[in-house]
């Protein structure tokens, strides 16, 4: 019996050390050398060197002076990430969307873009379409007392055009660019 147990236990210990210690350390080391920014969470820093968020995770922005992210089913918490999985007929979803439409409705009476009313699959998508961002441009320009053309130029400068897929705008990067403008209100801090 001992002849059977000893090799089995030795294999368990050896494989635990390889897969639980050695492999993670090697992968972490390679990632830190080859892709240090991504390995550390794709953190975004302001001019003072303070972490303002991650380029890969959405966050909530409140106030008319900021571009708003997509809604999050998990309140932008990474632990509770994910979609609500409500059916279109679910009263809770209908109520939330109606509240969001009322909150977002602008003076131009243009329909609210769907991306500003629906959560992403993860609930943490940091990107919006240029159209959803442009829909908010008038509100942001008015709140910051900027010409609409200047805000639109900032949107164009922050629009990413991937090789595959539609153009997108990272909301955090755009808001940080807004904050770099000389006309940024004193109370408008990320």
UniProtKB/Swiss-Prot annotation:
The chain crosses the membrane at residues 11-31. GO terms for cellular component: plasma membrane. Keywords: ATP-binding, Cell inner membrane, Cell membrane, Ion transport, Membrane, Nucleotide-binding, Potassium, Potassium transport, Transmembrane, Transmembrane helix, Transport. Its main location: membrane. It is found in: Cell inner membrane. It holds the Pfam family KdpC. GO terms for molecular function: ATP binding; P-type potassium transmembrane transporter activity. It is a single-pass membrane protein. Disulfide bonds: none annotated. It comes from the Bacteria. Belongs to the KdpC family. PANTHER family: POTASSIUM-TRANSPORTING ATPASE C CHAIN, POTASSIUM-TRANSPORTING ATPASE KDPC SUBUNIT. The system is composed of three essential subunits: KdpA, KdpB and KdpC. Part of the high-affinity ATP-driven potassium transport (or Kdp) system, which catalyzes the hydrolysis of ATP coupled with the electrogenic transport of potassium into the cytoplasm. This subunit acts as a catalytic chaperone that increases the ATP-binding affinity of the ATP-hydrolyzing subunit KdpB by the formation of a transient KdpB/KdpC/ATP ternary complex. This is Potassium-transporting ATPase KdpC subunit. It comes from Pseudomonas savastanoi pv. phaseolicola (strain 1448A / Race 6) (Pseudomonas syringae pv. phaseolicola (strain 1448A / Race 6)). The gene is kdpC.
């Amino acid at each position: 019996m001992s002849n059977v147990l000893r090799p089995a236990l030795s294999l368990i210990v050896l494989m635990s050390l390889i897969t639980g210690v050695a492999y993670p350390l090697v992968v972490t080391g390679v990632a830190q050398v080859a892709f240090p920014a991504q390995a550390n969470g794709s953190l975004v820093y302001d001019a003072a060197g303070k972490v303002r968020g991650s380029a890969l995770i959405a966050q909530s922005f409140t106030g008319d002076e900021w571009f708003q992210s997509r809604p999050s089913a998990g309140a932008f918490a990474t632990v509770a990430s994910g979609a609500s999985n409500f059916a279109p007929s679910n009263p809770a979803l209908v109520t939330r969307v109606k509240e969001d439409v009322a909150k977002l409705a602008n003076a131009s009476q243009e329909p609210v873009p769907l991306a500003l009313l629906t959560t992403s699959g993860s609930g943490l998508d940091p990107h919006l379409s240029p159209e959803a961002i442009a829909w908010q441009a008038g509100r942001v320009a008015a709140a910051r007392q900027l010409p609409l053309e200047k805000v639109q130029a900032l949107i164009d400068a922050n629009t990413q055009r991937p090789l595959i897929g539609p153009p997108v705008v990272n909301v955090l990067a755009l808001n940080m660019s807004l904050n770099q403008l000389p006309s940024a209100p004193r109370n408008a801090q990320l």
